[in-house]
Amino acid sequence: MYTAIPQSGSPFPGSVQDPGLHVWRVEKLKPVPVAQENQGVFFSGDSYLVLHNGPEEVSHLHLWIGQQSSRDEQGACAVLAVHLNTLLGERPVQHREVQGNESDLFMSYFPRGLKYQEGGVESAFHKTSTGAPAAIKKLYQVKGKKNIRATERALNWDSFNTGDCFILDLGQNIFAWCGGKSNILERNKARDLALAIRDSERQGKAQVEIVTDGEEPAEMIQVLGPKPALKEGNPEEDLTADKANAQAAALYKVSDATGQMNLTKVADSSPFALELLISDDCFVLDNGLCGKIYIWKGRKANEKERQAALQVAEGFISRMQYAPNTQVEILPQGHESPIFKQFFKDWK
């Protein structure tokens, strides 16, 4: 059981503190629980809140936005998310999920996959389409010499080359594959990141295996298919990757000193100095060119800034003209993910 929370005036039941999965559909601007047998079925015209309480009070709160949901419903979902997050002591890491571009973490909650139904809460339509498989399957390329970065790639052998390292994350098994011409810094980074994913995202329960080119285990072959001849690695590409990795991210400070949420760029290339993250403020880490925006919430930031995190992220996506389905991850201080930490110098 999680720490008890006050319930006076809340639209959510006391059971929100219970471990496990909780799903609500936003109906007439209110959260309505989704029965367990219907969890994994989502109406394209609606918005949902999905809360997962894991071990050791690790919580993730997802806002799922249907492709045909109204702005009113999306707004109500965001308001309810703020309320629920506050109710839980601002403990959860928050995620914005858009239909068809859900995160692997979100997909992992639904072992039978997702099903999309046309229409909305009051719709009579029941046409169903199946979402992607639920199991976590992710491939990262680890590349660079100085600004080494892990970037998600397509899950096939075409993404591989002999000059880099790759992390194949299959949930309970995490493989760090090292090309024959990869440099020692990439190999160390791949190992460290695989271990960090195990420890912070799987509570230490996943198996990490370091794989040498040519010694791939059967599980890798089962997921990726028969291994073809791989592209040769080019050491000069590491220097190009250093520059690209540095320029692919920027850091902004969020301030409401003028009564409106304003963003001030504090760094235009990574890796960033860890000292830039100040507990009194909130920050936007822009990795939108790679499909994701992060909001970091300092534990001493004022309440208005913390509660406006999702609104700030959506406004930023619009301002930068990123794709509407750009993923958003909102991280309370102390709950940073390994992928977020890699944008900073010497963050272990």
From Swiss-Prot:
A single Gene Ontology CC term: Flemming body
Residue spans of the Gelsolin-like repeats: 27-75, 148-188, 261-307
GO terms, molecular function: actin filament binding; cadherin binding; phosphatidylinositol-4,5-bisphosphate binding; protein domain specific binding; protein-containing complex binding
UniProt modification remark: The N-terminus is blocked.
UniProt-listed InterPro entries: ADF-H/Gelsolin-like_dom_sf (IPR029006), Gelsolin-like_dom (IPR007123), Villin/Gelsolin (IPR007122)
Any matching Pfam family: Gelsolin
Residues found modified as Phosphoserine: S337
UniProt modified residues of type N-acetylmethionine: M1
Biological processes per GO annotation: actin filament severing; actin polymerization or depolymerization; barbed-end actin filament capping; cell projection assembly; central nervous system development; protein-containing complex assembly
Primary site of residence: nucleus
Motif Nuclear localization signal, chain ranges: 137-146
Nucleus in keyword set: yes
Keywords from the UniProt entry: Acetylation, Actin capping, Actin-binding, Cell projection, Cytoplasm, Nucleus, Phosphoprotein, Repeat
Protein localization: Nucleus; Cytoplasm; Melanosome; Cell projection, Lamellipodium
Entry comment describing in which tissues the protein is expressed: Macrophages and macrophage-like cells.
SUPFAM superfamilies: Actin depolymerizing proteins (SSF55753)
Function: Calcium-sensitive protein which reversibly blocks the barbed ends of actin filaments but does not sever preformed actin filaments. May play an important role in macrophage function. May play a role in regulating cytoplasmic and/or nuclear structures through potential interactions with actin. May bind DNA.
Subunit record text: Interacts with NUP62. Interacts with NUTF2 and RAN; involved in CAPG nuclear import.
Protein family (similarity comment): Belongs to the villin/gelsolin family.
UniProt name for this protein: Macrophage-capping protein
Organism: Homo sapiens
